[in-house]
Amino acid sequence: EKIKDWFNSEQVEICGGLFNDHPEMVGPLTSRIWNLKKGRETLLNLVGKEVKVFAKTTQGLSADTPRVLHLAGFSKALLMPHGENNIPTFRGPVFSWSSSIGRQIETFCREPFSSSTNHTFFHLAFHLGKLLQQDSSHTLAFFKTTSNSSIFYNYLLKANSLAPIFGNWLTMSNYLHEVYPSEYPGPISQD
């Protein structure tokens, strides 16, 4: 019930969409689209609000993913690194992921910093300097992997609640609505 309240007040956003999380390339196109639509419908029934941003907790994306997402009703996605696998690196945090049928999905692809380790915050000045010099849209992303956060992350949240020292904290759909894609790579081949 508390999560529903957070979700409805725009403080928290659920990114997802899959009903069964299995490798993306398994099964025919209609089954993959059904899986996404059923996942969105299930989340809508659970929290009372539609999921706008696709995200996946395991690896297994294919070159056909943007097409499948578009056919299932998604226009935005979140790419997260999984273990040893890296995500594409672009000049900006958002790129337009093209499909073989010409449809595009706005995709966030910035590798997040861990909010659980003090190491992240020890090097925060370096990360900020790099962002200000090289990034087309200055964005810091944090990823919480454990229930315990670094004490510095908690200080950062507390300081930001007093004054917006690091700018605005946005949900992913609001962020993708405000930030324009910096690059438009062509469709990835099926090879």
PLM ranges: what are they?
Residues E1-D191:
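Catalytic-domain carbohydrate-binding cleft regions of carbohydrate-active enzymes
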